[in-house]
């Protein structure tokens, strides 16, 4: 029995014309997709997906499945939680870290001849670093009490203040002397006495002895001649001048003493205020030294 071959269905586009198969292939070549073009298109799709993933904001996932550190809360007990003091200069020197960024190898001064002023910023920087809190949730206890702010530096060279003349210091004293007392304390025809500026010498302020009057000598009337009366008038004028000068000096000293009493009370009040302020400063300094050590 002979096998019959079944005719295959042909695409009418591939049916060669009657005038030749070769000519039809040359005129209408068959275009098939190449393997390397498919691979190139797949690579481009992969790169596009990677670019999309890199541009999208994704949160990196950790491989650790336990609880994170920031989700925990530290147990804080005021009795057991204590801050220990650490010497920052020793810590930085052990780790080879310079105390301040200003101390580099390209410093214009040699290492042995550096000015003493360069040490001041480093100390202040270390003190500002020491005042920082050890934990972000616990603020530093001296953040409101420390007079030194972060980044604030003391002047390197402190100029010594010039001495003050005590005579130029004026204390506000509410003292207004009586004009009548000033008139009694001033010499007629001269400048008015000022108890604020007038100063007496040590000799003037010494106690004066009591002057006893001379014993009266009885002189009979027949001996009282013109020479006697002239001498008598002269002695009376001298005694009057002496009494007036002594009374004037006593009045001046009395007014001056009254002014000094008022000035003394004002100075005592000012000294009391200064001592109170000094006590507060000493307390703040003692608390600072207790936390951060002596300055």
Curated annotation (Swiss-Prot):
InterPro entries tied to this protein: bZIP, bZIP_sf, PAR_bZIP
Pfam families to which the protein is assigned, alphabetical: bZIP_2 (PF07716)
Domain of life: Eukaryota
Residue ranges of the region described as Basic motif: 227-247
Tissue-by-tissue expression: Highly expressed in liver; lower levels in lung and kidney.
Primary location: nucleus
Region (Disordered): 37-70, 93-167
PROSITE patterns membership: BZIP
Induction per the UniProt record: Accumulates according to a robust circadian rhythm.
Composition skew (Basic and acidic residues), residue ranges: 37-52
Any GO BP: skeletal muscle cell differentiation
GO MF terms held by the record: DNA binding; DNA-binding transcription activator activity, RNA polymerase II-specific; DNA-binding transcription factor activity, RNA polymerase II-specific; double-stranded DNA binding; RNA polymerase II cis-regulatory region sequence-specific DNA binding; sequence-specific DNA binding; sequence-specific double-stranded DNA binding
PANTHER family tied to this protein: HEPATIC LEUKEMIA FACTOR, THYROTROPH EMBRYONIC FACTOR RELATED
Family note: Belongs to the bZIP family. PAR subfamily.
Oligomer and partners: Binds DNA specifically as homodimer or heterodimer with other PAR factors.
Disease tied to this protein: A chromosomal aberration involving HLF is a cause of pre-B-cell acute lymphoblastic leukemia (B-ALL). Translocation t(17;19)(q22;p13.3) with TCF3.
Stated name of the protein: Hepatic leukemia factor
Taxonomic source organism: Homo sapiens (Human)
């Amino acid at each position: 029995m002979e096998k019959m071959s079944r005719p295959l269905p042909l695409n009418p586009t591939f049916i060669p014309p009657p005038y030749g198969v070769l000519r039809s292939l040359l005129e209408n070549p068959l275009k098939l997709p190449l393997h390397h073009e498919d691979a190139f298109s797949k690579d481009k799709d992969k790169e596009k997906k990677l670019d999309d993933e890199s541009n999208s904001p994704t949160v990196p996932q950790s491989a650790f499945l336990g609880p994170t550190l920031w989700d925990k809360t530290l147990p804080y007990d005021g009795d057991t939680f204590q801050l220990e003091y650490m010497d920052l200069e020793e810590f930085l020197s052990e780790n080879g870290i310079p105390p301040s960024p200003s101390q580099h190898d390209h410093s214009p001064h040699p290492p042995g001849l550096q000015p003493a002023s360069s040490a001041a910023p480093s100390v202040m920087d270390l003190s500002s670093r020491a005042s920082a809190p050890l934990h972000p949730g616990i603020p530093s206890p001296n953040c409101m009490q420390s007079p030194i702010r972060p980044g604030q530096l003391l002047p390197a060279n402190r100029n010594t203040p010039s001495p003050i003349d005590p005579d130029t210091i004026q204390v506000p004293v509410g003292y207004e002397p009586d004009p009548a007392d000033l008139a009694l304390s001033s010499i007629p025809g001269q400048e008015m006495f000022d108890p604020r500026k007038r100063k007496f010498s040590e000799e003037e302020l010494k106690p004066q002895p009591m002057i006893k009057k001379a014993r009266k000598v009885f002189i009979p009337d027949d001996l009282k001649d013109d020479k006697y009366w002239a001498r008598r008038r002269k002695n009376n004028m001298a005694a009057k001048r002496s009494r007036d000068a002594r009374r004037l000096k006593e009045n001046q000293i009395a007014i001056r003493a009254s002014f000094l009493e008022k000035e003394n009370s004002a100075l005592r009040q000012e000294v009391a205020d200064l001592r109170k302020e000094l006590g507060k400063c000493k307390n703040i300094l003692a608390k600072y030294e207790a936390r951060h050590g002596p300055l």
